[in-house]
Amino acid sequence: MTAATKLQSEDLRCAVVAEGLSLHNVSRREFCAAGGTLLAGDKVVSGRFSGDRLISVRTEKLGDVDLEADNYILATGKYFSGGLAADMDRLYEPLFGLDVEYDEDRSKWFDASFSAPQKFLEFGVKVQDGRALKDGVKIVNLYPAGEILAGISSAQCDARESVINSAMEAAAAIGRK
């Protein structure tokens, strides 16, 4: 059972924002059978916040239609899937403008030796109690999971396990609400 199907089977309204590869590893039939709605080929492009809550998201294909849920799981991955982006002087989360943990000295982002650990792979969204931070404020219904999290790197031996565990932890936290 995946984190998304666990939430659906418990009748918890949750939107999963997944641009990374995680959705390709989920049984779509199982997810939909549990009550989930999959917008295949669509992409979340913005979110509307009110105070410490994410109220709704909008997608590329649905345009100005607001999709609302009680909780949201952000599983957008890191750089290759667009979950994180960088310019010459900063690293940022482009979808919601979430706080990101990274070294501000760009020269320390990588090691010249290709086989050495690369620090930039450890960068990611900051969390407090499993929830995302935006401008230092904990967003109480937004749970980052997977590689978008600071400290999780695809180069780690246990990366797959860390990604799965973070998603299950997000689902468990939502279930406890």
Regions found by a protein language model. Give the residues of each.
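Residues forming the flavin
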Residues: M1-K177
